[in-house]
From Swiss-Prot:
Entry similarity comment: Belongs to the protein kinase superfamily. PAN3 family.
Region (Pseudokinase domain): 265-525
Subunit structure: Homodimer. Forms a heterotrimer with a catalytic subunit pan2 to form the poly(A)-nuclease (PAN) deadenylation complex. Interacts (via PAM-2 motif) with poly(A)-binding protein pab1 (via PABC domain), conferring substrate specificity of the enzyme complex.
Protein name (Swiss-Prot/TrEMBL): PAN2-PAN3 deadenylation complex subunit PAN3
Length: 664
């Protein structure tokens, strides 16, 4: 009987909530028309269609009907179909023991089941709530939003991104909240924290989505990547790479190596003094061994020497046979030490010496290896091909020279000094179209007793500046002996703007108008932009070349770690440093990277394979590789992530003291 009653109850429940039966024509007004469902409208709605064409009315009617069936207060309370008392015989319980094994005897005294949304029935004639109204026992404000652990609330201000730093985070805009909460969720659960895993689809569809800078969730920079930094001027395809893309360009590398070799060059078995004050290892830099005293009034020689104070290399200019008569003369060099300009060779010191078996004046300046003078570069001075005609200097190069010399004169004149020497043989060409004024402080010491005003000396600098440009444009060192012919040649070769600028400089001593370097720079301001743009392009090129060497230093450090760990003879008998563990993987990984052979047994020398393996090791990727021992008896399948972890743990073990390493 119990079984029959239970099955009947379940059958009634299934009929109450199951699929509706087929309705007849009398219920057609409560049935939604199929044309509305399929096409959105019914063309026979006004022509006698008996079905309902209002979907909202049908849904509301169906929901109210189902609520009456499921949440009726007159529904009978749930009671078990079979109740066993404590005094029942075992025989009567044996038939239903298996079915009732999970029901506690205390269930008989339990209160009848009622939905929480329905209040208890009272004797009062007026009910407290309407039967069809649901009062939820919880609200949205009481449900705390999921926030991942470790989420820093300090980033909420940056996530808001509206620039109002003074607005509290509880009242500011939250890009992860889908809709405003009318139940005051901020007051119910405390400060609102942004949920990075929530998506505001409604705001995205309405065009109001807010994407802030999520600095708290950014991945770390992948330093193992070779980022191609511009400019790019190669003609290879997108998938093609060559070895030169990973290192410095050959011309730049050769130039820097030659400069390094010239800096470290020594001259054994020389007759030069071994020590000049605090300098040693002197090497002569003059190409012409004939004495020339036309510029300074004394024969001068240039040497490269190394300082005993800081170990750096400097250029020493020696004035032979100079006798210092006034101590204040050499003190004038102190003002030149404060001149710091990229177009002026820096002066560091000046002193007298008898190391050359005479009385000499020594000037200490910066050393620029493999530098030439403008006379050697353009005027054929020191050229072994004496019969070859000098090449014409392009106007753009001359404008570059004028810009750099004007920059140097502006810095010198601003320091209340005068260059006094602007000669092709005393201007260094240290790079491609890169010049520096040299030997500027010498005349202040040599001609200290000659009294000339500073304004007159600065005007003379402008005249010497103009004569230098005319000399370079004519490609003749003695062209200024005939100024009229020189200017005719200069006018035919260059534009009127350059000619007018040179005329203005040559008339620098005339007092018809004010002339200084600032006025000259203002007059050539249009051409300064071209020179400045060229300097920016050179800076971009050097930055691009430098970026190629950025990752090479990282790979060297990685290979250094590998060699620190692999095959250490002092730990051969240490059980904690056995090569049967993770360090054995590193040993055969080194063979996998550097000691591969082809099918014929010949060594494989593949730089691309080495760089690829080391980059993957540094990144710790999940890619797995097969490592085979040297005797080909063991095979291991490991990932780069496991190899990186083994390398780091082994290297950290090396840094520990020997006592702690034995304990671990």
């Amino acid at each position: 009987m119990a079984t029959t009653g239970k099955s009947a109850t379940l059958e009634d429940a299934r009929h109450g909530t199951g699929s509706p039966k087929m309705k007849g024509r009398e219920n057609a007004k409560d049935t939604l028309c199929r044309n509305v469902t399929i096409y959105g409208r019914c063309r026979y709605e006004d022509k006698g269609c008996a079905f309902n064409h209002d979907p909202h009315k049908v849904n509301s009617g169906y929901q109210s009907d189902s609520n009456k069936k499921r949440l009726n207060v007159d529904s009978p309370s749930f009671t078990p179909s079979i109740l066993s008392s404590n005094g029942s015989s075992p025989t009567s319980q044996s038939a239903t023991m298996k079915k009732m094994a999970t029901i506690s005897p205390k269930a008989a005294s339990a209160a009848p089941f009622q939905p929480r949304s329905i209040s208890s029935r009272s004797n009062s004639s007026t009910p407290t709530t309407r039967p069809g109204t649901m009062t939820p026992d919880w609200s949205v404000a009481e449900v705390q939003e999921f926030v991942p652990q470790g989420f820093d609330t300090a980033h909420i201000g940056s996530l808001q991104g509206n620039g109002t730093a003074g607005v509290p985070s509880t009242s500011a805009f939250d890009p992860f909240v889908t809709a405003p909460n009318p139940l005051s969720a901020a007051n119910a659960v405390g400060p609102v924290q942004a949920n990075p895993f929530s998506h505001d689809t409604a705001a995205a569809l309405n065009g109001a989505a807010f994407f802030a800078n999520q600095s708290g969730f950014q991945q770390p920079v992948q330093y193992h990547m070779y980022a191609p930094i511009g400019p790019h001027s190669q003609n290879t395809l997108g998938y093609q790479r060559n070895v030169h893309d990973l290192f410095l360009p050959n011309d730049l590398r050769e130039e820097m190596q030659k400069k390094a070799a010239a800096t470290l060059q020594t001259l054994p078995n020389t007759q030069l003094p071994a020590q000049v004050d605090y300098f040693h290892s002197l090497v002569p830099l003059d190409l012409n061994h004939q004495k020339n005293a036309t510029i300074f009034g004394f024969p001068s020689w240039v040497y490269k020497a190394q300082s005993s104070k800081d170990g750096n290399f400097y250029a020493l200019r020696r004035l032979e046979g100079f006798r210092l008569t006034n101590e204040k003369a050499i003190r004038s060099v102190q003002a030149w030490k404060r001149v710091c300009n990229g177009s002026v060779v820096t002066v560091h010191d000046a002193f007298t010496s008898r190391s050359f078996q005479d009385s000499s004046l020594i000037f200490v300046t910066d050393y620029h290896p493999l530098s030439k003078t403008l006379a050697e570069q353009h005027l054929g001075a020191g050229n072994r091909f004496q019969g070859r005609h000098n090449t014409h200097i392009p106007e753009q190069v001359l404008w570059g020279y004028m810009t750099q010399i004007a920059n140097a004169l502006k810095a010198i004149h601003a320091s209340q000094l005068a260059a006094r020497i602007i000669d092709p043989s005393k201007i260094l060409l240290t790079g491609r179209n890169r010049i520096r004024l040299n030997a500027c402080a010498i005349m202040d010491v040599v001609q200290f007793d000659t009294q000339r005003s500073l304004a007159e000396l600065q005007r003379q600098d402008l005249v010497n500046f103009g004569q230098l440009i005319v000399t370079l444009g004519a490609n003749q060192p003695n062209v200024m002996h005939n100024p009229t012919k020189a200017m005719e040649h200069f006018t035919r070769a260059y534009t009127a703007q350059l000619k007018n600028s040179v005329f203005w400089l040559l008339n620098g001593l005339q007092k018809d108008q004010e002339r200084n370097i600032d006025i000259f720079i203002t007059g050539i301001s249009s051409t300064l932009m071209s020179t400045f743009d060229s300097a920016l392009h050179l800076d971009d090129q050097l930055t691009s070349d430098l970026s190629r060497e950025l990752e090479n230093g990282r790979l060297v450090r990685l290979m250094t770690k590998l060699n620190f760990v692999n095959e250490r003879p002092e730990y051969e008998h240490d059980r904690q440093w056995s090569e049967n563990g993770e360090r054995y993987f590193l040993k055969i990984f080194r063979d996998y990277v550097f000691h591969q052979v082809d099918a014929q047994g010949d060594p494989v020398v593949d730089l691309g394979h080495v760089l690829m393996c080391l980059n993957k090791l540094d990144a710790g990727t999940d890619e797995k590789i097969t490592l085979i021992s040297r005797d080909e008896q063991s095979c291991f399948v490991v990932s780069y992530k496991e190899l990186k972890k083994a390398l780091e743990s082994s290297f950290q073990a090396l840094l520990k003291p020997s006592a702690s390493r034995r304990l671990h």
